[in-house]
Curated annotation (Swiss-Prot):
Disruption phenotype: Mice show an increased expression of genes regulating fatty acid utilization and likely contributes to the absence of changes in energy metabolism in the aerobic heart. Display a preference for glucose utilization after ischemia and improve functional recovery of the heart. It comes from Mus musculus. The record marks 210 as: Essential for catalytic activity. PANTHER family: MALONYL-COA DECARBOXYLASE, MITOCHONDRIAL (PTHR28641:SF1), PTHR28641. The keyword Disulfide bond applies. Catalyzes the conversion of malonyl-CoA to acetyl-CoA. In the fatty acid biosynthesis MCD selectively removes malonyl-CoA and thus assures that methyl-malonyl-CoA is the only chain elongating substrate for fatty acid synthase and that fatty acids with multiple methyl side chains are produced. In peroxisomes it may be involved in degrading intraperoxisomal malonyl-CoA, which is generated by the peroxisomal beta-oxidation of odd chain-length dicarboxylic fatty acids. The keyword Nucleus does not apply. The modification N6-succinyllysine is found at residues 167, 221, 385. Keywords: Acetylation, Cytoplasm, Decarboxylase, Disulfide bond, Fatty acid biosynthesis, Fatty acid metabolism, Lipid biosynthesis, Lipid metabolism, Lyase, Mitochondrion, Peroxisome, Transit peptide. One of its GO terms (biological process) is malonyl-CoA catabolic process. Malonyl-CoA decarboxylase activity does not require any cofactors or divalent metal ions. Residues 1-38 form a transit peptide. This is Malonyl-CoA decarboxylase, mitochondrial.
């Protein structure tokens, strides 16, 4: 299950079809001084100047054509590097007036020292807040009022994130503009503006096609596969925005099962027990895939809102439901483990990953030293072809995976983005499952392991507060026992 929280690179959650670019003269290529002058002239005309504080509510909005010119020009840029350059110029040249900020800050400090009355101080603070608003925010605000403007800004942020990832544009001004745009999108895509829609086999063909295309966690193979995923004992929901009904923004797939699932094969490959749902067979709801369809909405809390809304819908439909859990992939585990094997392989004689008996057992099967042989086997997933090697690796891989999820941190929070997402939601790191994803993708990315993050509804609030505030991870006895085994065997 793909996570949506911070760190998730909010990644790129999906390799998926982007919304159409805004209209414009396609294939425009600008170069050298012509490109710079054209961009500067465009920005000078399109970005509204900041009115004086006293005139902030009396200044008319810029002509719609000015914003439309920016949209058209941007949509016509053929190369990612050109779009990145324009965004870099926008961030660098049309941000906050630091001179005004310094002046207003000094004014606030002076009034505090003079112990002036509250009304005077509050107005000075309001002036400071006004000075802290970057000029490009005005451009984004006016673009949002155009027909299709919000969609354009979602794509613009996707381009900005891609440009940052490719290092086409960098620096604090760019990061700040990304944060401002993310904040604005979070307001426009707050839960009050989102519609929850359920997908069934009778949904419009266009919706089914989009859901199929955006499924990157467990790809849909064909129409029969898609029919199974929206059929009996399955639920599929998505959020759409009130301005674009029927257009999926984030999609959640749910399996209705008798207990908490420990492998994905039983969900995506096996047919349901009956064509008609028998309510007495349903005791658990398993969130096995969540996918963001628009890269520009990374970091906007759509996934969290969607899970909460779906839980309420399922409780209405199945009051007897007693368990809510994810069945999540563990992206990055194999890469992390290969990194450790590389480090320890270079330091001859050092072994903090396997016990002596495990090393002997693995070497007996592979015929080579543990570190070197495992690097090849784990990268390719070939190790599962040997029953003896599979058995020998179960103990150490479970132990190492528990540490990766529970012990490896980024700024005090779980390094793994999927873990971080669910822990922020207040879920419990509940169970690691052996050979839970036997696909090639599952074997090469996470050694076939998957993990359940369980949602105890009455505890999610306190758990979330504890994780976000104190960085405490709530975990089950299984996880903690595996972590303790790792710590006893390692000095990491």
């Amino acid at each position: 299950m793909r996570g949506l929280g911070p760190g998730l690179r909010a990644r790129r959650l999906l390799p998926l079809r982007s919304p159409p670019r805004p209209p414009g003269p396609r294939g425009r290529r600008l170069c050298g001084g012509l490109a710079a002058s054209a961009m500067d002239e465009l920005l000078r005309r399109a970005v509204p100047p900041t009115p004086a504080y006293e005139l902030r509510e009396k200044t008319p909005a810029p002509a719609e054509g000015q914003c439309a010119d920016f949209v058209s020009f941007y949509g016509g840029l053929a190369e990612a590097s050109q779009r990145a350059e324009l965004l870099g110029r926008l961030a660098q040249g049309f941000g906050v007036d630091h001179g005004q900020v310094a002046e207003q800050s000094a004014g606030v400090l002076q009034l505090r020292q003079q112990a002036r009355e509250a009304a005077v101080l509050l107005q000075a603070e309001d002036r400071l807040r006004y000075a802290l608003v970057p000029r490009y925010r005005g451009l984004f605000h006016h673009i949002s009022k155009l027909d299709g403007g919000v969609r354009f800004l979602v794509q613009l942020r996707a381009d900005l994130l891609e440009a940052q990832a490719l290092k086409l544009v960098e620096g604090p001004h760019v990061r700040e503009m990304n944060g401002v745009l993310k904040s604005m999108l979070s307001e426009w895509f707050s839960s009050g503006f989102l519609n929850l829609e359920r997908v069934t086999w009778h949904s419009p063909c266009e919706v089914l096609q989009k859901i199929s295309e955006c499924e990157a966690v467990h790809p849909v193979k064909n129409w029969m596969d898609m029919k199974r995923r929206v059929g009996p004992y399955r639920r599929c929901y998505f959020f759409s925005h009130c301005s674009t009904p029927g257009e999926p923004l984030v999609v959640l797939h749910v399996a209705l099962t008798g207990d908490i699932s420990n492998n994905i094969q039983g969900i995506v490959k096996e047919c349901p027990p009956t064509e008609t749902e028998e309510r007495n067979r349903i005791a658990a709801a398993i969130f096995y895939s969540i996918s963001l369809t628009q890269q520009g909405l990374q970091g906007v809390e759509l996934g969290t809102f969607l899970i909460k809304r779906v839980v309420k819908e399922l409780q209405k439909e199945f009051p007897q439901l007693g368990a809510f859990s994810s069945l999540s992939p563990i992206p990055g585990f194999t890469k992390w483990l290969l990194g450790l094997l590389n480090v320890q392989g270079k330091e001859h004689g050092r072994n903090e990953l396997f016990t002596d008996s495990e090393c002997q057992e693995i070497s007996a099967v592979t015929g080579n030293p543990v570190h070197e042989s495992l690097k090849g086997f784990l990268s390719s997933g070939e190790w599962v072809k040997s029953e003896k090697l599979t058995q020998a690796l179960q103990g150490p891989l479970m132990r190492l995976c528990a540490w990766y999820l529970y012990g490896e941190k980024h700024r005090g929070y779980a390094l793994n983005p999927v873990a971080n997402f669910h822990l922020q939601n207040g879920a419990v790191m509940w169970r690691i499952n052996w050979m839970a994803d036997s696909s090639l993708k599952g074997l090469t990315s996470s050694c076939g392991l998957m993990v359940n993050y369980r949602y105890y509804l009455e505890e999610t609030g306190p758990n979330s507060i504890s994780y976000l505030g104190s960085k405490n991870i709530k975990a089950s006895e299984q996880i903690l026992s595996l972590v303790a085994q790792f710590q006893n065997n390692s000095k990491l």
